[in-house]
């Protein structure tokens, strides 16, 4: 009767790794643009998330996709699902 394919209801976000100093954890900065309600100007809002990185493979500057999971620790309820773009080496 209900033969539909199960879809993931977990949220996914794309952001830049700003810190990888912790063991098995990266800090990801998510930026989004919001229109100011009075002035109409678009302003950039940002938020940092701690995400689980089991193999310590991601470096600062990498663009990654994070996915919501069960809480791993007090501040960590996201996991890195894939690398979107590696950091440019200067």
UniProtKB/Swiss-Prot annotation:
One of its GO terms (cellular component) is cytosolic small ribosomal subunit. GO terms for molecular function: rRNA binding; structural constituent of ribosome. InterPro entries: NA-bd_OB-fold, Ribosomal_uS17, Ribosomal_uS17_bact/chlr, Ribosomal_uS17_CS. Keywords: Ribonucleoprotein, Ribosomal protein, RNA-binding, rRNA-binding. GO terms for biological process: translation. Part of the 30S ribosomal subunit. HAMAP family: Ribosomal_uS17_B. This is Small ribosomal subunit protein uS17. It comes from Burkholderia cenocepacia (strain HI2424). The gene is rpsQ.
């Amino acid at each position: 009767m209900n033969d539909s394919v199960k879809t993931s209801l977990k949220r996914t976000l794309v952001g830049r790794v700003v810190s990888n100093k912790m063991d098995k954890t990266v800090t990801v900065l998510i930026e989004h643009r919001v229109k100011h309600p009075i002035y109409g100007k678009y302003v950039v809002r940002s938020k940092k998330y701690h995400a689980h990185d089991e193999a310590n493979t991601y470096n600062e500057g990498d663009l990654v996709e994070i996915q919501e999971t069960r809480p791993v620790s007090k501040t960590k309820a996201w996991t890195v699902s894939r690398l979107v773009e590696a950091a440019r080496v200067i």
